[in-house]
Protein backbone atom coordinates (compact mmCIF):
# COMPACT_ATOMS: atom_id res chain seq x y z
CA UNK A 1 0.00 0.00 0.00
CA UNK A 2 2.91 2.35 -0.64
CA UNK A 3 0.74 4.30 -3.09
CA UNK A 4 -1.20 5.75 -0.16
CA UNK A 5 1.90 7.67 0.90
CA UNK A 6 1.94 9.57 -2.41
CA UNK A 7 0.78 13.14 -1.92
CA UNK A 8 -1.76 13.32 -4.74
CA UNK A 9 -3.22 9.83 -4.25
CA UNK A 10 -5.97 9.73 -1.66
CA UNK A 11 -7.57 6.40 -2.45
CA UNK A 12 -6.23 2.94 -3.31
CA UNK A 13 -8.43 -0.11 -3.75
CA UNK A 14 -7.55 -3.76 -4.18
CA UNK A 15 -8.63 -6.63 -6.35
CA UNK A 16 -11.59 -8.71 -5.15
CA UNK A 17 -9.84 -11.87 -6.26
CA UNK A 18 -11.35 -14.83 -4.45
CA UNK A 19 -15.02 -15.57 -3.88
CA UNK A 20 -14.67 -17.77 -0.81
CA UNK A 21 -18.03 -19.48 -1.27
CA UNK A 22 -17.65 -19.98 -5.03
CA UNK A 23 -18.41 -23.75 -4.96
CA UNK A 24 -21.78 -23.30 -3.20
CA UNK A 25 -24.12 -22.68 -6.14
CA UNK A 26 -24.43 -21.66 -9.76
CA UNK A 27 -24.97 -18.04 -8.70
CA UNK A 28 -21.74 -17.89 -6.68
CA UNK A 29 -19.81 -19.33 -9.61
CA UNK A 30 -21.29 -16.76 -12.01
CA UNK A 31 -20.47 -13.97 -9.57
CA UNK A 32 -16.89 -15.24 -9.45
CA UNK A 33 -16.78 -14.97 -13.25
CA UNK A 34 -18.05 -11.39 -13.07
CA UNK A 35 -15.38 -10.57 -10.51
CA UNK A 36 -12.63 -11.98 -12.73
CA UNK A 37 -13.76 -9.80 -15.64
CA UNK A 38 -14.44 -6.68 -13.62
CA UNK A 39 -11.15 -6.56 -11.76
CA UNK A 40 -8.60 -8.62 -13.70
CA UNK A 41 -9.46 -6.95 -17.01
CA UNK A 42 -11.73 -3.92 -16.61
CA UNK A 43 -10.16 -2.18 -13.62
CA UNK A 44 -6.62 -3.16 -14.59
CA UNK A 45 -7.13 -1.67 -18.06
CA UNK A 46 -8.35 1.60 -16.55
CA UNK A 47 -5.34 1.72 -14.26
CA UNK A 48 -2.85 0.95 -17.05
CA UNK A 49 -4.40 3.50 -19.43
CA UNK A 50 -4.53 6.27 -16.83
CA UNK A 51 -8.32 6.47 -16.84
CA UNK A 52 -10.75 6.37 -13.90
CA UNK A 53 -10.65 3.17 -11.83
CA UNK A 54 -13.90 2.84 -9.91
CA UNK A 55 -13.78 1.68 -6.31
CA UNK A 56 -15.98 -1.41 -6.13
CA UNK A 57 -16.66 -1.24 -2.41
CA UNK A 58 -15.01 -4.54 -1.46
CA UNK A 59 -11.72 -3.40 0.08
CA UNK A 60 -9.41 -0.42 -0.18
CA UNK A 61 -7.54 2.30 1.69
CA UNK A 62 -8.85 5.86 1.70
CA UNK A 63 -7.54 8.84 3.63
CA UNK A 64 -9.92 10.01 6.35
CA UNK A 65 -8.90 13.57 5.54
CA UNK A 66 -10.35 13.08 2.06
CA UNK A 67 -13.69 11.82 3.37
CA UNK A 68 -13.92 14.78 5.76
CA UNK A 69 -12.93 17.25 3.04
CA UNK A 70 -15.64 15.90 0.73
CA UNK A 71 -18.30 16.18 3.42
CA UNK A 72 -18.43 12.54 4.43
CA UNK A 73 -20.47 9.73 2.94
CA UNK A 74 -23.68 10.77 1.17
CA UNK A 75 -26.42 8.76 2.88
CA UNK A 76 -28.89 9.45 0.07
CA UNK A 77 -26.78 7.47 -2.44
CA UNK A 78 -27.25 3.70 -2.64
CA UNK A 79 -23.77 3.11 -4.10
CA UNK A 80 -21.62 5.20 -1.79
CA UNK A 81 -18.45 3.73 -3.32
CA UNK A 82 -19.22 5.01 -6.82
CA UNK A 83 -20.47 8.31 -5.42
CA UNK A 84 -17.31 8.97 -3.43
CA UNK A 85 -15.12 7.85 -6.34
CA UNK A 86 -16.46 10.60 -8.60
CA UNK A 87 -16.52 13.19 -5.84
CA UNK A 88 -12.84 12.40 -5.31
CA UNK A 89 -12.03 12.62 -9.04
CA UNK A 90 -13.96 15.86 -9.54
CA UNK A 91 -12.13 17.38 -6.56
CA UNK A 92 -8.82 16.78 -8.34
CA UNK A 93 -7.62 13.75 -6.38
CA UNK A 94 -6.45 10.38 -7.67
CA UNK A 95 -7.93 6.90 -7.27
CA UNK A 96 -5.61 4.00 -8.01
CA UNK A 97 -6.13 0.27 -8.47
CA UNK A 98 -3.65 -2.37 -7.21
CA UNK A 99 -4.08 -5.73 -8.92
CA UNK A 100 -1.25 -7.43 -7.01
CA UNK A 101 -2.96 -6.96 -3.64
CA UNK A 102 -5.63 -9.63 -3.27
CA UNK A 103 -8.80 -9.51 -1.21
CA UNK A 104 -11.62 -11.92 -0.50
CA UNK A 105 -15.38 -11.74 -0.37
CA UNK A 106 -18.58 -13.72 0.01
CA UNK A 107 -20.94 -13.76 -2.97
CA UNK A 108 -24.73 -13.94 -2.84
CA UNK A 109 -25.86 -17.55 -3.14
CA UNK A 110 -29.31 -17.37 -4.72
CA UNK A 111 -31.04 -15.53 -7.54
CA UNK A 112 -33.33 -13.65 -5.11
CA UNK A 113 -30.36 -12.17 -3.26
CA UNK A 114 -28.65 -11.52 -6.60
CA UNK A 115 -31.72 -9.59 -7.79
CA UNK A 116 -31.86 -7.41 -4.67
CA UNK A 117 -28.12 -6.72 -4.67
CA UNK A 118 -27.89 -5.84 -8.36
CA UNK A 119 -31.04 -3.72 -8.14
CA UNK A 120 -29.34 -1.61 -5.49
CA UNK A 121 -26.18 -1.38 -7.59
CA UNK A 122 -28.13 -0.37 -10.70
CA UNK A 123 -30.23 2.23 -8.89
CA UNK A 124 -27.23 3.72 -7.11
CA UNK A 125 -25.17 3.82 -10.29
CA UNK A 126 -28.00 5.54 -12.17
CA UNK A 127 -28.26 8.03 -9.31
CA UNK A 128 -24.58 8.83 -9.79
CA UNK A 129 -25.06 9.14 -13.56
CA UNK A 130 -27.81 11.75 -13.09
CA UNK A 131 -25.74 13.55 -10.47
CA UNK A 132 -22.26 13.61 -11.99
CA UNK A 133 -22.42 13.23 -15.80
CA UNK A 134 -22.73 16.95 -16.52
CA UNK A 135 -20.19 17.86 -13.85
CA UNK A 136 -17.76 15.39 -15.36
CA UNK A 137 -18.07 16.97 -18.81
CA UNK A 138 -17.48 20.45 -17.39
CA UNK A 139 -14.52 19.43 -15.20
CA UNK A 140 -11.37 21.22 -16.40
CA UNK A 141 -8.96 19.03 -14.49
CA UNK A 142 -9.67 15.88 -16.51
CA UNK A 143 -8.45 14.92 -19.96
CA UNK A 144 -10.82 14.05 -22.80
CA UNK A 145 -10.03 10.34 -22.36
CA UNK A 146 -10.82 10.47 -18.65
CA UNK A 147 -14.09 12.29 -19.30
CA UNK A 148 -15.13 9.79 -21.97
CA UNK A 149 -14.24 6.83 -19.77
CA UNK A 150 -16.02 8.40 -16.81
CA UNK A 151 -19.19 8.95 -18.83
CA UNK A 152 -19.16 5.38 -20.09
CA UNK A 153 -18.58 4.14 -16.55
CA UNK A 154 -21.38 6.25 -15.06
CA UNK A 155 -23.88 5.20 -17.71
CA UNK A 156 -22.98 1.51 -17.93
CA UNK A 157 -26.27 0.43 -16.33
CA UNK A 158 -28.21 2.14 -19.11
CA UNK A 159 -26.66 -0.19 -21.70
CA UNK A 160 -29.03 -3.10 -20.90
CA UNK A 161 -31.93 -0.70 -21.51
CA UNK A 162 -30.53 0.24 -24.91
CA UNK A 163 -30.06 -3.43 -25.78
CA UNK A 164 -33.65 -4.25 -24.81
CA UNK A 165 -34.97 -1.25 -26.75
CA UNK A 166 -32.96 -2.30 -29.81
CA UNK A 167 -34.49 -5.79 -29.63
CA UNK A 168 -38.01 -4.37 -29.44
CA UNK A 169 -37.45 -1.96 -32.34
CA UNK A 170 -35.76 -4.67 -34.43
CA UNK A 171 -38.64 -7.13 -34.00
CA UNK A 172 -41.21 -4.40 -34.73
CA UNK A 173 -39.41 -3.31 -37.90
CA UNK A 174 -39.05 -6.87 -39.09
CA UNK A 175 -42.76 -7.62 -38.83
CA UNK A 176 -43.67 -4.21 -40.26
CA UNK A 177 -41.76 -4.78 -43.50
CA UNK A 178 -40.11 -8.23 -43.54
CA UNK A 179 -39.46 -8.14 -47.29
CA UNK A 180 -37.14 -5.16 -46.92
CA UNK A 181 -35.03 -6.92 -44.31
CA UNK A 182 -34.77 -10.06 -46.39
CA UNK A 183 -33.50 -8.00 -49.32
CA UNK A 184 -31.03 -6.20 -47.04
CA UNK A 185 -29.57 -9.36 -45.57
CA UNK A 186 -26.07 -8.08 -46.29
CA UNK A 187 -26.56 -5.43 -43.59
CA UNK A 188 -26.41 -8.19 -40.98
CA UNK A 189 -22.66 -8.51 -41.51
CA UNK A 190 -21.64 -5.15 -39.96
CA UNK A 191 -24.35 -5.52 -37.33
CA UNK A 192 -22.94 -8.90 -36.36
CA UNK A 193 -19.45 -7.47 -36.03
CA UNK A 194 -20.79 -4.64 -33.87
CA UNK A 195 -22.68 -7.03 -31.62
CA UNK A 196 -19.63 -9.25 -31.24
CA UNK A 197 -17.35 -6.37 -30.27
CA UNK A 198 -19.93 -4.36 -28.33
CA UNK A 199 -22.81 -6.23 -26.73
CA UNK A 200 -20.74 -9.34 -26.04
CA UNK A 201 -17.71 -7.47 -24.68
CA UNK A 202 -18.35 -8.59 -21.07
CA UNK A 203 -18.14 -12.23 -22.15
CA UNK A 204 -14.79 -11.55 -23.80
CA UNK A 205 -13.60 -9.88 -20.59
CA UNK A 206 -14.51 -12.99 -18.61
CA UNK A 207 -12.64 -15.23 -21.03
CA UNK A 208 -9.53 -13.04 -21.00
CA UNK A 209 -9.59 -12.72 -17.22
CA UNK A 210 -9.96 -16.48 -16.74
CA UNK A 211 -7.06 -17.04 -19.15
CA UNK A 212 -4.83 -14.57 -17.30
CA UNK A 213 -5.67 -16.28 -14.00
CA UNK A 214 -5.00 -19.72 -15.47
CA UNK A 215 -8.52 -20.96 -14.77
CA UNK A 216 -9.27 -23.08 -17.82
CA UNK A 217 -12.13 -25.23 -16.56
CA UNK A 218 -14.19 -22.18 -15.67
CA UNK A 219 -14.55 -21.44 -19.41
CA UNK A 220 -17.41 -23.95 -19.49
CA UNK A 221 -19.52 -21.62 -17.34
CA UNK A 222 -19.23 -18.59 -19.63
CA UNK A 223 -22.32 -19.47 -21.77
CA UNK A 224 -24.39 -19.54 -18.57
CA UNK A 225 -23.67 -15.83 -18.08
CA UNK A 226 -26.56 -15.25 -20.47
CA UNK A 227 -28.77 -16.03 -17.46
CA UNK A 228 -27.48 -13.05 -15.51
CA UNK A 229 -27.37 -11.03 -18.75
CA UNK A 230 -31.15 -11.29 -19.15
CA UNK A 231 -31.72 -10.83 -15.42
CA UNK A 232 -29.76 -7.58 -15.48
CA UNK A 233 -31.80 -6.30 -18.42
CA UNK A 234 -34.96 -6.79 -16.35
CA UNK A 235 -33.31 -5.23 -13.29
CA UNK A 236 -32.15 -2.12 -15.13
CA UNK A 237 -35.54 -1.62 -16.80
CA UNK A 238 -37.36 -1.86 -13.46
CA UNK A 239 -34.88 0.39 -11.66
CA UNK A 240 -34.91 3.04 -14.40
CA UNK A 241 -38.72 3.18 -14.26
CA UNK A 242 -38.61 3.52 -10.46
CA UNK A 243 -36.05 6.32 -10.66
CA UNK A 244 -38.09 8.21 -13.25
CA UNK A 245 -41.20 7.98 -11.08
CA UNK A 246 -39.19 9.03 -8.02
CA UNK A 247 -37.84 12.11 -9.77
CA UNK A 248 -41.34 13.07 -10.95
CA UNK A 249 -42.85 12.85 -7.46
CA UNK A 250 -39.77 14.42 -5.86
CA UNK A 251 -38.63 11.41 -3.85
CA UNK A 252 -34.91 11.59 -3.04
CA UNK A 253 -34.48 9.04 -0.26
CA UNK A 254 -34.29 5.34 -1.15
CA UNK A 255 -34.41 2.28 1.07
CA UNK A 256 -31.15 0.35 1.34
CA UNK A 257 -31.87 -3.37 1.50
CA UNK A 258 -29.07 -5.26 3.21
CA UNK A 259 -27.51 -8.09 1.20
CA UNK A 260 -27.97 -11.49 2.85
CA UNK A 261 -24.67 -13.10 3.90
CA UNK A 262 -24.08 -16.42 5.61
CA UNK A 263 -20.73 -15.75 7.25
CA UNK A 264 -18.40 -17.15 4.58
CA UNK A 265 -16.64 -13.85 4.00
CA UNK A 266 -13.67 -14.50 6.27
CA UNK A 267 -12.93 -18.21 5.79
CA UNK A 268 -13.10 -20.95 3.22
CA UNK A 269 -16.08 -23.27 3.22
CA UNK A 270 -15.21 -26.64 4.70
CA UNK A 271 -15.73 -28.88 1.69
CA UNK A 272 -14.24 -32.30 1.24
CA UNK A 273 -11.55 -32.58 -1.47
CA UNK A 274 -14.01 -34.31 -3.81
CA UNK A 275 -16.46 -31.40 -3.57
CA UNK A 276 -13.97 -28.63 -4.23
CA UNK A 277 -13.67 -27.39 -7.84
CA UNK A 278 -10.38 -28.26 -9.47
CA UNK A 279 -8.60 -26.15 -12.04
CA UNK A 280 -6.33 -27.60 -14.70
Spell out what each predicted region is.
Residues 1-78, 119, 123-130:
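Long helical/loop segments within the catalytic core of UDP-sugar-dependent glycosyltransferases
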Residues 2, 84-85, 114:
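Short, hydrophobic alpha-helical packing/hinge segments within bilobed ligand-binding/sensory domains
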Residues 18, 77, 83, 87, ...:
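Transmembrane helix-bundle signature of multi-pass membrane transporters/permeases
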Residues 85-104:
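Catalytic donor-sugar/metal-binding loop of nucleotide-sugar-dependent glycosyltransferases
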Residues 106-123, 253, 258:
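Nucleotide-sugar-dependent glycosyltransferase catalytic core
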Residues 114-132, 230-240:
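Intracellular alpha-helical coupling/juxtamembrane segments of multi-pass membrane proteins
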Residues 134-151, 169-280:
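Juxtamembrane C-terminal module of membrane proteins
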Residues 151-166:
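Transmembrane alpha-helical segments and their cytosolic interface motifs
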